[in-house]
Amino acid sequence: MAESGLAMWPSLLLLLLLPGPPPVAGLEDAAFPHLGESLQPLPRACPLRCSCPRVDTVDCDGLDLRVFPDNITRAAQHLSLQNNQLQELPYNELSRLSGLRTLNLHNNLISSEGLPDEAFESLTQLQHLCVAHNKLSVAPQFLPRSLRVADLAANQVMEIFPLTFGEKPALRSVYLHNNQLSNAGLPPDAFRGSEAIATLSLSNNQLSYLPPSLPPSLERLHLQNNLISKVPRGALSRQTQLRELYLQHNQLTDSGLDATTFSKLHSLEYLDLSHNQLTTVPAGLPRTLAILHLGRNRIRQVEAARLHGARGLRYLLLQHNQLGSSGLPAGALRPLRGLHTLHLYGNGLDRVPPALPRRLRALVLPHNHVAALGARDLVATPGLTELNLAYNRLASARVHHRAFRRLRALRSLDLAGNQLTRLPMGLPTGLRTLQLQRNQLRMLEPEPLAGLDQLRELSLAHNRLRVGDIGPGTWHELQALQVRHRLVSHTVPRAPPSPCLPCHVPNILVSW
């Protein structure tokens, strides 16, 4: 028996070593740690030093990387590599990331030589691409059809290709500003098949005329800071949805525009033509226009006929032109019935323009040659809330005591930098700000300030006032007055008690 028992041990040992039957599905204890397994979840793949806050997001911003990182998960949809030192994009690495929707390469050292033609070929779901602030000399020949936003600004791009931005039905925004693009580097079919582009920025390039065949879907077009001297006839005939057009800082002359240049822009609200070489207001302005910038041109006269179509204009900016005594003849602005603000800073006007629109709210006329204010000069604009006549040639003897009588809504009056020797009479009682610095005021009397109980700020710096030149009762009604800016301040002494007036006088700081 003993021998037979010993003989069974090898068989029992063999049975113990044999694997058991496979487990029945649904009967395993999920909480039981099986051999070789860990209680911790498997770590997600994330490149060294980068952060991966989500399974689809890899952030390698500002790590001074010189080589494209490996170990990027194929599940990545958002990859940020901005602010590094990358010089090239390896095709084999990018081709793995076919699910990318956002690729940010802003502020690297990527050159066109380091960007293969097929670099983005496999990124069929890419929607947002930023390669701004790199060293590209030509744009990529091919960008994915799925693209919605493309930013190639601040490179050295001299040429783009038909399929860089063409045939992109979902493309909405293209940023190409601060490059070296000339018209020769912009093919006529550059945007063919991309009928959804709403924003196109081509500012700070070397364009000499407005590019043809722009997308008809445009809403915002930036062309400032180029060399544009001409808008070809019909170049803007299809852009009926355009709302904002920026053409400032170019070389536009009157001959570079015609009566049809802007006439088809039935949605245009904002037009900036400042810093050009225009001598007249352009013709054919659309009725929808609300803001027109014409500052820093060479305009000598404004003709009513040129503004007849722009009846909806609210802001007209004509600062730093060559408007003289006949620059704004009576009725020139009459078509602009809804005009809110008129800027005429830095011209040669010797009087307030006559027959201004009745609804005008802000008249800005500093640094002109206005030497007088007559009794009727401002009667046509009773709704004015801001009047700026600073740095003109106004003398007290030539400011009529009824010049401001109709300006009951006026809140801000700037008469700084003139030749006034006393406060004007008849100031509107609703004034809150009165600027009188840099005149020749020799005294302050209570009568001109009577009733100005809403005045909050009164500036008298750089006049010829002394403390003793301020008459008793001058400050009586200025209970809310505050002087915000002062160089040398004196506390105004309280006036001696008057038998007719209460002695409650504010302690006011005034600068002179």
From Swiss-Prot:
Pfam families: LRR_8 (PF13855). It is found in: Secreted, Extracellular space, Extracellular matrix. The keyword Glycoprotein applies. Residues 37-74 form the LRRNT domain. Gene3D superfamilies: Ribonuclease Inhibitor. Residues 1-26 form the signal peptide. N-glycosylated. Keywords: Extracellular matrix, Glycoprotein, Leucine-rich repeat, Repeat, Secreted, Signal. Belongs to the small leucine-rich proteoglycan (SLRP) family. SLRP class V subfamily. GO terms for molecular function: extracellular matrix structural constituent. InterPro entries: Leu-rich_rpt, Leu-rich_rpt_typical-subtyp, LRR_dom_sf, SLRP. Coiled coil: none annotated. One of its GO terms (cellular component) is extracellular matrix. LRR repeats lie at residues 75-96, 99-119, 125-146, 147-167, 170-193, 196-216, 217-238, 241-261, 267-288, 289-309, 312-332, 338-359, 360-380, 383-396, 409-430, 431-451, 454-474. This is Podocan-like protein 1. Glycans are attached at N71. SMART domains: LRR_BAC (SM00364), LRR_SD22 (SM00365), LRR_TYP (SM00369). It comes from the Eukaryota.
